[in-house]
């Protein structure tokens, strides 16, 4: 069985709390709100999966590549997210995490159900590739060294 912990605050908070109460999900969905980074780190350490179902806002607003996904991948937490904006640049579908279409609750539920059936041997290579992706492609020190090498070659 899954337990969900939704961190942060935002425009959907009131609606989510209402839905949790309406569907009597208080025993499986927790919304602790905003937490300082050291508490978020402790919560990540306890997580089995990191879920970030990003969607395009009604005004067309999109986030780029969420740092929260990078952080989860870097510390070895499997990620499930959406085919949204720059996320596929970070999460390679079925290789370094799992992606579902935006606004597709059924696909998200199916992905989480499938995730729950994976064993450690199946997760290990995905977690390894995710960490390698973040360490190589999104590590500021690596990027700076590569840029310095390019500039020296000019």
Predicted regions and their residues:
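Conserved acidic donor-binding segment of nucleotide-sugar-dependent glycosyltransferases
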Residues: 93-94, 98-105, 114-120
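Acidic donor-binding loop of glycosyltransferase active sites
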Residues: 45-61, 77
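A short, well-ordered alpha-helix in the C-terminal region of glycosyltransferases
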Residues: 114, 121-137, 146
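Short glycine/serine-rich donor-binding loops of glycosyltransferases
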Residues: 62-69, 87
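Nucleotide-activated donor-binding/catalytic signature segment of Leloir-type glycosyltransferases, i.e.
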Residues: 15-38
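Short alpha-helical donor nucleotide-sugar binding micro-motif in glycosyltransferases
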Residues: 34-35, 42-47
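Short acidic/histidine- and often glycine-rich active-site loop of Leloir-type glycosyltransferases
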Residues: 81-94, 98-99
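Short hydrophobic beta-strand element within catalytic cores of glycosyltransferases
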Residues: 69, 74, 78-81, 91
């Amino acid at each position: 069985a899954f337990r969900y912990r939704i961190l942060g605050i935002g425009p959907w908070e009131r609606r989510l709390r209402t839905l949790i109460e309406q569907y009597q999900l208080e025993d499986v969905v927790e919304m602790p709100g905003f937490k300082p980074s050291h508490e978020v780190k402790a919560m990540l350490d306890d997580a089995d999966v990191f879920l970030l179902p990003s969607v395009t806002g009604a005004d067309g607003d999109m986030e780029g590549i969420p740092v929260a996904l990078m952080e989860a991948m870097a510390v070895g937490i499997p990620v499930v997210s959406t085919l949204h904006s720059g996320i596929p640049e970070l999460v390679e579908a079925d290789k370094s995490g799992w992606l579902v279409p935006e606004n597709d609750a059924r696909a998200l539920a199916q992905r989480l159900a499938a995730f729950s059936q994976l064993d450690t041997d199946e997760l290990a290579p995905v977690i390894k590739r995710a960490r390698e992706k973040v360490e190589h492609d999104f590590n500021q020190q690596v990027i700076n060294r590569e840029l310095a090498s390019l500039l020296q070659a000019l």
